[in-house]
Amino acid sequence: MQRLPIEQYSALLAEKQQKLTALLAPFNSPPLDVFASETSHFRMRAEFRIWHEQDDFYHIMFDQKTKQRFRIDQFPIASQLINQMMLALLPLLKQHNILTHRLFQIDYLSTLSNKIIVSLLYHKTLNEEWLQAATQLKQQLIKQGFDVQIIGRANKQKICLQQDFVDEILPVKNQQYIYRQVENSFTQPNATVNCKMLEWAINCTKNSQGDLLELYCGNGNFSIALAQNFRKVLATEIAKPSVSAAQFNIAANKIDNLHIIRMSAEDFTQAMNGVRAFNRLKGINLQDYQCNTIFVDPPRSGLDMATVKLVQNYERILYISCNPYTLCENLQELTKTHRIEKAALFDQFPYTEHMESGVWLIKKSN
């Protein structure tokens, strides 16, 4: 892997700050709160293709521009734990032919709490012999001091040697939050910047009256940290593994005012507007909630127009965006009814064009 341009980090971040400031200028945004990343070892997950060459094999990546493959032995943007595991894993895999045969990818998911999942992906069916060798591999890694989960994946097959999750512990505002992270589900990749995002969101919403609604809550990353600022929190999520992780996280963090329902933002919009009833909402009276704050963290495509209209009904809007261009499209509508009170840049992905941002909007008085 090429050396990281660490000495350029501040200049690259300043460039992003200028770009986002310019994008938000038409909406009368206040100056940005800027949250920097660690300059190396900041990424908690990584995926590598495996290249086989005669008796050898190694991690590779592809150059996005030239599509050329290049060998990776160390990966300075990934956590120290992932780098340690990369060095330890390959020599051990080489001891077991059954583990290397038709292996085409390795995924790593690590935590600040020093746990790691290694997923081995194959172009073949995994059998009992594979399971025995993988169990031996896991024991060898535990002997080296790793707190590791091993998962084997193949077409329509997933074998967990113990479990397919790790429990992360995030320090946020003098509190420790437990988050179950499930393999192959979305988690924030930059843990220290995620902590800064949570702190910023808590600061925005402190002294809130009433209840919070969150759309697209994932494993409860934001709603769990924000629950302290509200009477009640109602959150929606569509992916089953994320919903069950969120339910675990609610219990683990002893949160008693947060309810998660498994439905899409679009369906929830229909339910809120009384367009149709949903079985999934049985036992939940939407009238019991006085949600005057809404939190959205949509996919790269931003909010669809129906959800923008729904969001505009709320007094306060907290919007976390992974795509400033779709954020600005949404702001063209949202700023007709709301003003930007605070805006932030979170450098989740250093040394890339990617910009994670947040805006805190308050309804304009008529």
Curated annotation (Swiss-Prot):
Q: Indicate yes or no for the key word Oxidoreductase.
A: no
Top enzyme category: transferase
Q: Which GO biological-process labels does this protein carry?
A: tRNA methylation
Pfam family for this entry, one: tRNA_U5-meth_tr
Check the record and name the Gene3D superfamilies matching this protein.
Answer: 2.40.50.1070, Vaccinia Virus protein VP39
> Which reactions appear under catalytic activity for this entry?
uridine(54) in tRNA + S-adenosyl-L-methionine = 5-methyluridine(54) in tRNA + S-adenosyl-L-homocysteine + H(+); uridine(341) in tmRNA + S-adenosyl-L-methionine = 5-methyluridine(341) in tmRNA + S-adenosyl-L-homocysteine + H(+)
Keywords, A to Z? Methyltransferase, S-adenosyl-L-methionine, Transferase, tRNA processing
Which InterPro entries does the record associate with it? MeTrfase_TrmA_AS, MeTrfase_TrmA_CS, SAM-dependent_MTases_sf, TrmA_MeTrfase, U5_MeTrfase_fam
User: Example GO molecular function term?
Assistant: tRNA (uracil(54)-C5)-methyltransferase activity, S-adenosyl methionine-dependent
Q: Keyword S-adenosyl-L-methionine on this protein?
A: yes
- One annotated Gene Ontology cellular component of this protein: cytosol
**Which domain of life does the protein's organism represent?**
Bacteria
Q: Which residues form the active site?
A: 322, 356
Q: Where does S-adenosyl-L-methionine bind?
A: 188, 216, 221, 237, 297
Q: What is its EC number?
A: 2.1.1.-, 2.1.1.35
Which PANTHER family does the annotation name?
Answer: TRNA/TMRNA (URACIL-C(5))-METHYLTRANSFERASE (PTHR47790), TRNA_TMRNA (URACIL-C(5))-METHYLTRANSFERASE (PTHR47790:SF2)
The similarity comment for this entry is: Belongs to the class I-like SAM-binding methyltransferase superfamily. RNA M5U methyltransferase family. TrmA subfamily.
Q: Explain the purpose of this protein.
A: Dual-specificity methyltransferase that catalyzes the formation of 5-methyluridine at position 54 (m5U54) in all tRNAs, and that of position 341 (m5U341) in tmRNA (transfer-mRNA).
Q: By what name is this protein known?
A: tRNA/tmRNA (uracil-C(5))-methyltransferase
What organism does the UniProt record list as the source?
Histophilus somni (strain 2336) (Haemophilus somnus)
Q: Which gene encodes it?
A: trmA
